[in-house]
Design a protein with these regions (language model features):
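Recognition helix of helix-turn-helix/homeodomain-like DNA-binding domains
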Residues: 1-6, 29-31
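Hydrophobic micro-packing sites on short alpha-helices
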Residues: 7, 11-16, 26
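Generic detector of low-complexity/intrinsically disordered segments
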Residues: 13-14, 21, 119
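Short C-terminal boundary/hinge segments that cap the last helix of small helical domains
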Residues: 20-35
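Membrane-embedded alpha-helical signal segments
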Residues: 38-231
Length: 231
């Protein structure tokens, strides 16, 4: 806990990734009592606050920006941003939005797993929704390796299987676990690889892992990077 009463969120996130289980399963949310008096409402609030710390994408804002997120314009703009990012091979997670009294009235921040990725103030009310969504889109694009998690990868794999069943069937998660695929994909993204290579990454991973079952993650990342650069 690093000397605090709060859990180490980064450690919790990493344990979920390694064990390939959800935070609910790891924390035993369904069957553990964590209040001294057995107060169900208090227990629910505690788990809710803890789960909030595991949000891959969150936008918090000051009181004067609340109307922006109640307006239909925000919903329309965020859908457009999702479509644009999808065309680049990026699956944008759902954005949790909430007001925060700790921010200035026209200030907003974009967080991932409680880490602040961007924070600034909106100086004018003109096109507030457009500007904030533009910032969200840019932040996701620039920080996708940090935002990406096993659930997003699983959704991408399942969608890919609909169009290319032979590529996925018997491969993911049978030979390549979602956790391992996520780790390799994140490392390649950090090296500047474009996300739209996702299907080729799976194809090369499967080939290399069958050819050399003892290949390390670092060797695999290097091999995939080289093969994709040859194209």
């Amino acid at each position: 806990e690093r000397g605090h009463s709060l859990p180490d969120i980064l450690l919790l996130k990493e344990l979920c990734r390694i064990l390939e289980i959800s935070a609910d399963d790891l924390l035993g949310i369904e069957n553990r009592k964590i209040t001294e008096n057995g107060n169900d409402l208090a227990q629910e609030e505690i788990w809710h606050k803890l789960q909030n710390c595991l949000e891959p994408l969150e936008c918090i804002f000051g009181k004067d920006l609340v109307p922006v997120f109640l307006d239909g314009t925000y919903q329309e703009k965020i859908v457009e941003a999702r479509k644009k990012l999808a065309g680049e091979g990026i699956l944008m997670p759902l954005v949790r939005i909430r007001d925060d009294e700790g921010l200035a009235s026209r200030e907003f921040a974009i967080l991932s797993y409680r880490q602040t990725l961007r924070k600034e103030s909106v100086e004018t009310e003109i096109e507030d929704a457009s500007y904030i969504v533009e910032c969200l889109e840019k932040t996701v694009r620039e920080n996708y390796a940090h935002i990406l998690n096993r659930d997003l990868v699983k959704d991408m794999v399942e969608n890919l299987q609909k169009k290319y069943p032979a590529l996925i069937r018997g491969v993911v998660p049978e030979r390549i676990s979602y956790g391992y695929l996520t780790d390799v994909f994140k490392q390649l993204l950090k090296r500047g690889l474009a996300p739209w290579y996702f299907s080729r990454i799976i194809e090369i991973m499967d080939s290399e892992c069958r050819r050399n079952p003892t290949i390390t993650e670092e060797e695999l990342v290097c091999t995939i990077g080289k093969k994709l650069q040859e194209k």
